[in-house]
Amino acid sequence: MAFNYSIANTVDDAAQSIAENTSSLATFSKPPLVIAHRGYKAKYPENTILAFQQAVKAGADCVETDVRLTKDEVVCILHDRNLNRVFGVDVDVRDLDYELDNGHFRTIQEPHEPLPTYEQFLHELTKHPGVNLLVDIKPVNDLLIIPRMVDAMLRVNSDLDFWKDKVSFCLWSHRFIPACDRYAPSIPLYHIGFNFAYAERHFVMHPRVKGVSMAVALFLLPHSQDFVDLVHAQGKQVFAWTLNTPSSIYLALIRGCDGLLSDDPVMARALSQGPIVTKSWHYFHYSEWLHMIYGFLRAQFVFFLLRTFVL
């Protein structure tokens, strides 16, 4: 299996690149955005109104969430295709009649929150000026999800431009761009991905795309700095996900990422404002680096599957 970007031949190659970036690290002109991944997932049931509220209370600049479309075409907030992991109910979201069935669903994790809709999230968002919602639109979604999302937005506020500085659509696949152009022309777009070449080919140069959000393990690659510099040269942002260890936050910071997606926004904020970037790569436990290398290999495999069957 061949990939456009392969992992460094040895951990030392990646470490040398990291060390070179650390030694020449410039002072940030402004601190990176802290983005709460699925809300305050580290402490509260993921992708719930409570997790959203607590993320904002904890000081997150943005909240990232996921959307899925039910059988009755309700856009709900859910990461997995199946409800079993979070709600303990073995049902595919595409077989769910939200209006009929939702009253039965509560998260396994206490305090047992209900499955929210995108529209409910938007109502909550309007209570928090200055907070942006990043909406992860999985590539396995039907394109119909875009107009249904817009319908929900217009029900909350009939002026679509009201949302342009509050909501961003985050796309894995370029197949969704025409639907966004048709139904949501004023809503900012971001790319979420596993592969620099795909991101550069379909998103980095696109005039509507405001930035990219890449798996943090990709930033182990020495030439990842070239990608970051390319995106920044277009006046766009680079985010990294998901940063739940000191070493992952360190890696994102020394590469110059503008946004840090983390399950724990309090931890991410504290580390991003501390002296972490003055450390050397070997300051962090080797198991964290090994975990990221595994994450890189896994990301490349998943990208191969997506490119073959979905993208």
Curated annotation (Swiss-Prot):
Keyword Hydrolase appears in the UniProt entry: yes
GO CC field: endoplasmic reticulum; lipid droplet; mitochondrial membrane; mitochondrion
Compartment annotation: Mitochondrion membrane; Lipid droplet
Keyword line: Hydrolase, Lipid droplet, Lipid metabolism, Membrane, Mitochondrion, Transmembrane, Transmembrane helix
Principal location: mitochondrion
Single Gene Ontology MF annotation: phosphatidylglycerol phospholipase C activity
Chain ranges of the GP-PDE domain: 32-272
Transmembrane segments: 289-310
Tagged with keyword Mitochondrion: yes
Signal peptide residue numbers: none
Catalysed reaction equations from the record: a 1,2-diacyl-sn-glycero-3-phospho-(1'-sn-glycerol) + H2O = sn-glycerol 3-phosphate + a 1,2-diacyl-sn-glycerol + H(+)
EC primary class: hydrolase
Membrane topology: Single-pass type IV membrane protein
EC number: 3.1.4.-
Domain of life according to the entry: Eukaryota
Assigned protein family: Belongs to the glycerophosphoryl diester phosphodiesterase family.
Name of this protein: Phosphatidylglycerol phospholipase C
Species per Swiss-Prot/TrEMBL record: Schizosaccharomyces pombe (strain 972 / ATCC 24843) (Fission yeast)
